[in-house]
Regions:
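Inter-heme linker and motif-flanking segments adjacent to c-type heme-binding CXXCH motifs
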Residues: 20-23, 54-55, 115-116
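Electrostatic cytochrome c docking/interface patches
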Residues: 18-40
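Gly/Gly-Pro-rich "capping" loops immediately C-terminal to redox-active cysteine motifs
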Residues: 34-38, 50-85
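Cys/His/Pro-rich metal-binding microdomains
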Residues: 46, 63, 95
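C-terminal motif of bacterial Sec signal peptides marking the signal peptidase cleavage site
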Residues: 13-16
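Bacterial N-terminal signal peptides that target proteins for export
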Residues: 1-5
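The canonical Cys-X-X-Cys-His
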Residues: 37-51, 109-113
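C-terminal capping alpha-helices of c-type cytochrome domains
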Residues: 33, 85-87, 92-93, 97-116
Length: 116
């Protein structure tokens, strides 16, 4: 009887919890290039740069990286050429990915980053 009560109590508590679910590419309205970039971001960037916060991450959040004329912290232009260069060659504590990502993958990644 006590086990039944505990089960129902736990079920009732969990029913009230909102579990954050990752949205699909379609729900985010991503095109094929942006979706490919999202997969690259998940594999190569997310360990240091969470899209929406930098909590417990080494690098800054990438949310809105292209919504401002200059990159936060460095004052460098926030454009595809400059951000692509940082992705390829790195900066300060960030390693470059020029040996692991093709130019097409960098372009896909930039397309996704524009959606953040």
């Amino acid at each position: 009887m006590a086990a039944c009560f505990c089960f129902f109590l736990l079920a009732a508590m969990l029913a009230g919890c909102d579990v954050e679910r990752r949205k699909s590419d379609a729900e985010l309205g991503l095109n094929a290039q942006q979706a490919a970039g999202r997969r690259i971001y998940d594999d190569a960037c997310d360990r240091c740069h969470e899209p929406y916060s930098s909590r417990d991450k080494k690098g800054p959040s990438m949310k809105g990286v292209f919504k401002h004329p200059y990159l936060a912290g460095s004052g460098l232009p926030a454009n595809d050429a400059r951000v692509g260069e940082i992705i390829l060659y790195g900066r300060a504590k960030m390693p470059g990915f020029g040996q692991t990502l093709s130019q097409q993958q960098v372009n896909d990644l930039l397309a996704y980053m524009h959606t953040l």
